Amino acid sequence: ELTVGAEGLETVTARTTVPGSFPEFTQTYGLDEDGNRSIIIEYMKEAGSYYGANVEYRIEGENGFVYEGFAFPIEGYDEISIDNNAYSPVVTYINDKHIFVWDDEADGKYEIKFRDNTISKGVRKYRLHLYKLSEEMYRKLNAEYDADSNPFAGLGLSSPSFTYSNIDNGAGWFCAYSKSISDWMIE
């Protein structure tokens, strides 16, 4: 809980819970004959929990050349999708990087699919950044997603601002997440 006050102003209060780490998980990397790549995350889901993930890549080429970044959206990756087994998944941002977000309605198995069209030759490595989100962070990310995905906002037919705040006597959000990073998977 965070409480801030000043003389002559109402006291502002916000609450969140820092979540524990992402549950123990296994990861499986796959590549089909069409060049579609996928990473399947299997974990023991916890009731009332919220999760997120993104994929980091690293291509170590000849002469020490290294090409690295996150798999969504970057030039050279033209397709990323998520398996339909995730309940209400959204794609939004944490620290300026796209992240897939889902809640505990997923069945303990989550699949991220992507196509790698980079021309770079070399050793390709992928790893997961896995997030366990507080309920406030999950609600904040969903609100941002709703605002960013609102086709009517640009037409002036609805408010372009997101509508979630967990600040009493104020506006904004106070939320938390924990992050785990998997080992590199080599193609």
Named regions from a protein language model:
Residues 1-187:
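A sequence/structural signal for flexible, mid-protein segments enriched
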